UniProtKB/Swiss-Prot annotation:
InterPro entries: PDZ (IPR001478), PDZ_6 (IPR041489), PDZ_sf (IPR036034), Pept_S1C_Do (IPR011782), Peptidase_S1_PA (IPR009003), Peptidase_S1C (IPR001940)
Family: Belongs to the peptidase S1C family.
Region (Serine protease): 128-289
Name under which the protein is recorded: Probable periplasmic serine endoprotease DegP-like
Species per Swiss-Prot/TrEMBL record: Chlamydia trachomatis serovar D (strain ATCC VR-885 / DSM 19411 / UW-3/Cx)
Active site: H143, D173, S247
Transcription listed as a keyword: no
Catalytic activity: Acts on substrates that are at least partially unfolded. The cleavage site P1 residue is normally between a pair of hydrophobic residues, such as Val-|-Val
Any one GO molecular function term: serine-type endopeptidase activity
CC annotations in GO: outer membrane-bounded periplasmic space
The entry's keywords: Hydrolase, Periplasm, Protease, Repeat, Serine protease, Signal, Stress response
EC number assigned by the record: 3.4.21.107
Function, in words: Might be efficient in the degradation of transiently denatured and unfolded proteins which accumulate in the periplasm following stress conditions.
Extent of the signal sequence: 1-16
Length: 497
């Protein structure tokens, strides 16, 4: 059976991997491309209807394509490993090779067996972007312009520009760059929340360097998460053909509006097999607006660790159906603690909107500006109550950055990860996702798959708690208590400060 492989859609001079983006037009052309199904009492033949559908796609392509651009990123260093959201350059040391599982390798941020067999050098990263303002703001994926040296942008008419980075957001894999030009054609955003399964979807991009390629499919699913591509996931799934080089390009509706930014595919070979993922336009636009105005993204913070609800938990906590998110821990001093949230509360709605999944709630809170008041509907001991909470700014990641400087990448552990690793569902700790070869962490014995249980003799159960501990111990060596299997050990990471 073909093994599943998550790919981001990048194209390089030696190797291609998938990515996505989006674009806009000067005017909303909705009225121009509506399909004429009937005219008065006159019946429309099947042939005429098909012609109208075809013309509709043609009109979208004609109006949107001028707003889609070809991006070439010449990184600061020429010889680099293949970049992707799940495979950060230079992070190696996989103790789990015996699983022989491509998805497992991707999850741990490691090169797949296929990638290890390919040349690991490149001269340029090539992808797609789309213009969102007439004065030259361009949206693409973060992984297209990551580690940028020179960025070249080629318009549909062949004009070439050098671009500068305006803002990056690796947590959603979005980026904004800018070219010095005026009166450009640009794309507008549609409402991704209004999408229905089966709606038409049109992708425009530069697969394998073939510029202005248009493909058509449908919306296959919404709200895809737990793919471990980026931190905040709420992907639209489509069968519109997306291939290496499409990264950062737009996914459009039949009105020519951007409903998503193409980002990744599932594939056994690195190419298209009918499953592609796009960042929904509502999430993308909120991130993009902040990148353009501030150069960075400010996210809301509640201060809870959550667990998905399954049918057994729904019965145990007397829920009317399988929905909501279970609070497994409350961060000390957080908005959640101050508002009175407790361990084992089940959050079933926020501001009147039902919590369909843990990821949906997490994404919604993260998109709220600090100071936003949100009313949480809680099921506690079988009773329903409402608790108002004022969201604050998500804590800085100084602690995580300190670990990254030492060569370690971490993430919160989830029930899905526990299942994958054969751990108990209630396992607490922080998962080591990857370790950079030759780093202080690698030399000290830190390895992917280990669980960090304590830092500087303080128990930690979330990345937020890790941040707080490390922020209070700047300039000091870091003492980690880690476990792997039944073995617990202590590791000292020496600080450079």
């Amino acid at each position: 059976m073909m093994k599943r492989l998550l790919c981001v859609l990048l194209s390089t001079s030696v190797f291609s991997s998938p990515m996505l983006g989006y674009s806009a037009s000067k005017k909303d052309s909705k009225a121009d491309i509506c399909l004429a199904v009937s005219s008065g009492d006159q019946e429309v033949s099947q042939e005429d209807l098909l012609k109208e559908v075809s013309r509709g796609f043609s009109r979208v392509a004609a109006k949107a394509t001028p707003g889609v651009v070809y991006i070439e990123n010449f990184p600061k260093t020429g010889n680099q490993a293949i970049a992707s959201p799940g495979n950060k350059r230079g992070f190696q040391e996989n103790p789990f090779d015996y699983f022989n599982d491509e998805f497992f390798n991707r999850f741990f941020g490691l090169p797949s067996h296929r990638e290890q067999q390919r040349p690991q050098q490149r001269d340029a990263v090539r992808g797609t972007g789309f213009i969102v303002s007439e004065d030259g703001y361009v949206v693409t994926n973060h992984h297209v312009v990551e580690d940028a040296g020179k960025i070249h942008v080629t318009l549909h008419d062949g004009q070439k520009y050098t671009a500068k980075i305006v803002g990056l957001d690796p947590k959603t894999d979005l980026a904004v760059i800018k070219i010095q030009a005026e009166k450009l054609p640009f794309l507008t955003f549609g409402n991704s929340d209004q999408l229905q399964i089966g709606d038409w979807a049109i992708a425009i991009g530069n697969p394998f360097g073939l510029q202005a390629t248009v493909t058509v499919g449908v919306i296959s699913a919404k709200g895809r998460n737990q793919l471990h591509i980026v931190d905040f996931e709420d992907f639209i799934q489509t069968d519109a053909a997306i291939n290496p080089g499409n990264s950062g390009g737009p996914l459009l509706n039949i009105n020519g509006q951007v409903i998503g930014v193409n980002t990744a595919i599932v594939s056994g070979s690195g190419g298209y097999i009918g499953i592609g993922f796009a960042i929904p336009s509502l999430m993308a636009k909120r991130v993009i607006d902040q990148l353009i105005s501030d150069g960075q993204v400010t996210r809301g913070f509640l201060g809870v660790t959550l667990q998905p609800i399954d049918s057994e938990l729904a019965t145990c906590y007397k829920l009317e159906k399988v929905y909501g998110a279970l609070v497994t821990d409350v961060v000390k001093g957080s908005p959640a603690e101050k508002a009175g949230l407790r361990q084992e509360d089940v959050i079933v709605a926020y501001n009147g909107k039902e919590v369909e999944s843990l990821s949906a709630l997490r994404n919604a809170i993260s998109l709220m500006m600090p100071g936003t008041r949100v009313v949480l509907k809680i099921v506690r001991e079988g009773k329903t109550i409402e608790i108002p909470v004022t969201v604050t700014q998500i804590p800085t990641e100084d602690g995580v950055s300190a670990l990254q400087k030492m060569g370690v990448r971490v993430q919160n552990i989830t029930p899905e990860i526990c299942k994958k690793l054969g751990l108990a569902a209630d396992t607490r700790g922080i998962l080591v996702v990857a370790v950079e070869a030759g780093s202080p962490a690698a030399s000290a014995g830190v390895a992917p798959g280990q669980l960090i249980l304590a830092v500087n003799r303080q128990r930690v159960a979330s990345v937020e708690e890790l941040n707080q501990v490390l922020k209070n111990s700047k300039g000091e060596n870091v003492l980690l208590m880690v476990s792997q299997g039944d073995v617990v050990r202590f590791i000292v990471l020496k600080s450079d400060e």
